[in-house]
Amino acid sequence: MANLEDLIARVSDRRLQAEMASALGILKRRQRFGLVFEEHLPETTVLVGLPIQVGSLVQRRDDLGARTLYRVIDLTADQQACIVPLDSDAAESLPLASLLVVKRFGDPIFPTLTSLGALRRGDTSRPSHAVINGENYHALQLLTFLFAGQVDCIYIDPPYNTGARDWKYNNRYVDDNDTWRHSKWLSFMAKRLQLARRLLRPDGVLIVTIDEHELHHLGMLLEKVFPAHARYMVSIVINPKGRREPNFSRIDEQAFFVVPSTGAEIVQGTTSLQAILPLIDSETDDEEDERPEEDEVPAAEQADDAIDWEYRHARRRGAESSYRHQRPNQFYPIFIDEAPRRVVRVGASIAVNDEPHLGHIDGLRPIWPIDAEGRHRCWRYTPDSMQARIELGNVVLGKYNRTQDSWTVNIRYPRNKSRKLKTVWWDTAHDAGTHGTQLLSKMLGAPGLFPFPKSIYAVRDSLAAVVRNRPRALIVDFFAGSGTTFHATCLLNADDGGQRRSILITNNEVAEAEARLLYEQGHYRGDPAFEAAGIFDRVTRPRCEAVVTGLRADGAPIAGKHIGGRPLHTGFTENVEFFRLDYLEADSVDLGLEFAALLPLLWLGAGAVGEHRLPSDTGGFLVPDDSTFGVLFRESRFRPFRAALDQRPDVTHVWLVTDSEQAFAEMCAALPADKRVAMLYRDYLRHFRARARQTA
């Protein structure tokens, strides 16, 4: 090393000398044992649409493999750029329209999201999922600005690096002939996993699926990036028929669950019943008498499934908290149809002093929470919560008491038979052929548009292991592919009424053979014909739209059903918005010229509730009626802004536009302590400048 330092000191080019000294410093700090791999040249990414300036790094649009990079040294009035290759001094002039900006990882970037459209089938209070078309490393940098320490589960299915040219490094496919392919893959993954770690909550879990090609390398990398976490490897049988290979027929792939070593049971066990049932919150008090009463014994026709279900009276009992005056909102009728022995619906709660109406209404008999002694008790759940359980079939009639002419209303719960999940999953629902490839073909109306999609149920069960008891979980997938994670999240929400939301990230990569054909036809990156052939435009977005609407892109209803009987054509009552990752100039942001471009970020970071509309006249501040954030544009309007926030306890995030640190501190002190407050545009610019320094 000392000899190298002497040689570097003799280099006359001071800039080159500094770069060589920096590289040597990295070598000296590098570990010599454990997982050792080359960092390689900095990764690069093409930024379609970013304006070209003097000093920009660019490539030619017709250079499919990005073999040559150039530096822009001059711009002319006739829309020409004078460029110089990085490896020579031979300048040439090309039209600006023939060039694309390239960024190296470590160069400062200032990303934003541009909406490409939305689907809203859920109500306005339901948060939106987000599906982002963009380079996942930059998108992860953006998410660390918005969601550091807030993500419940990250599920990723990265490229498996099989040697079959199934992924790119520096815009070039990596194949079996590349002797550095494993090292490149590790370098590629390490950068992204380090950002992913910043996103996770203290009890957040990372799930990574992989096969034998990088299994052991990945395990060591996860140990390095997540040293304070336990790593569990689960084998999932995805191809019961097996692949034709020498010696063994492989039927499985692996999933690493990277779980915080907190001592708590973070991964939730399951049974076959619980996999399709809603979460049940007991809503019981410690002092409630939990001994079953005679009328809680299931009716004869319910005894057959008593091994799987426990039946509990729908009426609270035992403690003082079970009486009507303690919970007046939980005193209401449950209407039943006696002939078919069916619980139909709930009625409205009545005032404490009102007497319950006992007569039939529309042929339905009302059952009130009144015990055998005539005491007014209350039901276990509020009307909305009880109605949700009725619709799921979990509120049933029990025994009929002929003497008192009364019915028992029971709620059924899955018996507590939950066991720890095993490390081998063999379930026909996880077959990637039937529930991945074939399902995707149904939804897109054409086969072969995406290779090897996951079974939706393998993804659902993986997510459920982490978020089953987190109905408002935030889920991220930054190798989104065909959008299976979004579909699985919708299915979990439909099963239990949850409001989990997912953020999916994928690029718009075009398959190699098709990209070459398009280039031969004169269609390049950024051209509509080229982009239409990409994974986001052709697969991810159409699949997510089909999931929500139940319709293919051609308007035809999707045939078939989910396991459990839910028709595909019914879709889901979810909201989802599609975005493109774009890039801003720091000076424009600093001057306050880019608020409209940043508005979707603020909306997404505040929970993605409602819509992100910018009115023509804000009056100095913005507190959207249907969203959960507020923005102050002018300090002089702070008092009415503060008054508006007082009327909106649902607002969670506040952004203050000011150049004064002191004014920001004073306004923060005057705001409620439960608000997340940030300073525009300082915090945004600082974050991405800091990320660039950490990457360099």
What are the functions of these language-model segments?
Residues 1-123, 127-128, 144-148, 152, ...:
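Accessory, often C-terminal, charged low-complexity segments
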Residues 117-126, 169-177, 433-447:
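Short glycine/proline-rich turn/loop motifs
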Residues 124-156, 160-162, 166:
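Conserved helicase NTPase motor core
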Residues 149-168, 222, 475-489, 598:
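Conserved proline-anchored active-site loop of SAM-dependent methyltransferases
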Residues 152, 158-167, 415-455:
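Active-site-adjacent "gating/activation" loops or surface patches in catalytic cores
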Residues 166-172, 516-521:
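Short, flexible, mixed-charge acidic loops at enzyme active sites
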Residues 176-195:
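Glycine-rich S-adenosyl-L-methionine
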Residues 204:
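Glycine-centered, small-residue-biased loops immediately flanking beta-strands
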